[in-house]
Amino acid sequence: MTRTIAIGDIHGCLTALDALLAAIEPKKSDILVPVGDYIDRGPDSKGVIERLMELREKTQLFPLMGNHEEMMLSVLDRRREPFGWLNHGGHNTMESYGFAGDLSVIPVSHREFLESLLPYYESPTHIIVHANYDSQMRLENQSADLLRWVKISHQMPKPHFSGKHAVMGHTHHPEGQIVQLPHLTCIDTYCYGGKWLTALELETQRVWQSTPEGEVREFMLEPVPSPAS
């Protein structure tokens, strides 16, 4: 049976990602949807990108673009001065590449991977975005700014008109908790801050979580009842 598994914001935490993948044991038939923000803040952004590139050969990978990948690409393309990105964790990414003042230390294959990242993923039952969405608009018509930048703590979206359940990251919970509402689930559980990296199997609501040190736990996510009409 095909599993669809969303993975929350990794932020350079390669040990946590490897522990999570060892627990999940992804198969060729599985669909993995990392929600974006693979880089910055944590210690090994380079290693995370390499691991995701390897996963493309082992499973069906649909990686989304987060705001941190957008910032990095805009610096690489000379469309943005580097200071904003560096101050939001970009310096950690550059350190993982052994940066010595020359952006060419980033391999072309890594840049091509970043350029290939998707704006969203949609299945018959779910929509997966990095940050947020407009509840009345089809995903292909949504702005990149909303999909990648707007925290649900600043603008909580209503249920999507399609009736599909939304899954996202970007807005981390300071205590590392999964945020659940009847119409959405946020799986940014603050791994780089010492909490958890979360993976969620959409079909069963099975959850895998790992700490930055690689300790893993599993549990089933209890459904949130819809408010009585």
Residue ranges, per PLM feature:
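Acidic, His/Gly-rich catalytic cores of divalent-metal-dependent hydrolytic chemistry
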Residues: 147, 152, 158-229
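Active-site neighborhood of phospho(di)ester-bond hydrolases with catalytic His/Asp-centered motifs
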Residues: 7-8, 32-36, 63-66, 165-171, ...
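His/acidic metal-ligating clusters that form di-metal
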Residues: 106-176
